[in-house]
Amino acid sequence: MRQIGDSYVAKNAIVTGDVVLSAGVNIWFGCVLRGDLARITLGPRVNLQDGCIVHTDYGEPQVVEEGVVVGHRAVLHGKLIGHDTLVGMGAIVLSGAEIGHECVLAAGTLVTERRRIPPRSLVMGVPGKVVREVTDDDLRRTLSIAAHYLDMAQRYAKGAFPPPWGRPPGEGG
């Protein structure tokens, strides 16, 4: 994990083009961010877990606001992900979609093109449908995950974790 300014980016992550990283952003192993067609802006403490893809359409910038957590292998191709939203593992947000603040997109959810999701919505399914309002407990969980990943990124950057191949036998754990 390398530190770039106040952000943390895994050594094998690809960040190219017009991409703005705010303080505390943490981009994990195998992520690809392509700001080649329009700007991608990641707000403070955004967490992109392993294998995420973030891209845009030509001339349509994407903003991922403060405190957003994006689960493993999710794809963001939308316009806006509102603050403190959790995008579950493998979820897909298609072109021009706008996700309100404090939402939860369940794992595997597909948000279709140009769809607008209201704030504090729990969205599930293919295509994604709002199933209920996000509770305060749901929101606390998102905030906790964001804080946990930022802490881990800081520890990785300081060398607190072993190399990717792990520890040799007999060295404990």
What kind of region is each of these model predictions?
Residues 5, 10-11, 16-17, 22-23, ...:
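Left-handed beta-helix
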Residues 6, 10, 60-62, 66-75, ...:
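C-terminal segments of enzyme domains that contribute to small-molecule binding surfaces
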Residues 39:
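Phosphate/pyrophosphate-binding betaalpha-module
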